[in-house]
């Protein structure tokens, strides 16, 4: 199974890269967790933010192949417990399609990305910093896998 986090923003601090890679490497070979970074467009004082979001959305969708699943991470998405995420992870595994987890930039996701989503997931009603979201997603995917495999990490 292939999971990809497609996220707007690059040049993250080293601790973010280390945290992400720590959880990605803990997963078994049959569960690949990849990160695809989409460069954040420069936002000047007079920037057309709607156009920038649309461009970022186009770049995100260009990384998705036909037939792949899109799951958006949105404040107004559905909150999942660890056990519910494990259930979703198992469904995705049985579905045998690549799953693309989409995280937008500071202003969120382009409407075109949201329109293509098969599922909408909310990590929290709080606004979370994007570097932390990457690590949180990696850790929660790892934790969900440990639930499915009976590993003692999740007690």
Swiss-Prot record:
Domain of life: Bacteria
Coiled coil: none
Any one GO molecular function term: rRNA (pseudouridine-N3-)-methyltransferase activity
InterPro entries reported for this sequence: Alpha/beta_knot_MTases (IPR029028), RlmH-like (IPR003742), tRNA_m1G_MTases_N (IPR029026)
Broad class of enzyme this protein falls into: transferase
Entries under Pfam families matching the protein: SPOUT_MTase
Species this protein is from: Pseudomonas putida (strain ATCC 47054 / DSM 6125 / CFBP 8728 / NCIMB 11950 / KT2440)
Gene designation per UniProt: rlmH
Keywords: Cytoplasm, Methyltransferase, rRNA processing, S-adenosyl-L-methionine, Transferase
Keyword Glycoprotein part of the UniProt annotation: no
Family affiliation: Belongs to the RNA methyltransferase RlmH family.
Protein name per the record: Ribosomal RNA large subunit methyltransferase H
Assembly information from the UniProt record: Homodimer.
């Amino acid at each position: 199974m292939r999971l990809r986090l497609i996220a707007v923003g690059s040049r993250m601090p080293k601790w973010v890269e280390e945290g992400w890679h720590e959880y990605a490497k803990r997963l078994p070979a049959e569960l690949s967790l990849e990160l695809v970074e989409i460069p954040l467009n420069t936002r000047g004082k007079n920037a057309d933010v709607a156009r920038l979001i649309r461009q970022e959305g186009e770049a995100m969708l260009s990384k998705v192949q036909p037939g792949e699943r899109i799951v958006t991470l949105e404040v107004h998405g559905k909150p999942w417990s660890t056990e519910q995420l494990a259930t979703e992870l198992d469904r995705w595994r049985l579905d045998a399609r690549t799953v693309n987890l989409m995280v937008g930039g500071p202003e969120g996701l382009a409407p075109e990305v949201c329109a293509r989503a098969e599922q909408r997931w909310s990590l929290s009603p709080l606004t979370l910093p994007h570097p932390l979201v990457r690590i949180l997603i990696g850790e929660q995917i790892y934790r969900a896998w440990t639930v499915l495999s009976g590993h003692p990490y999740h007690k």
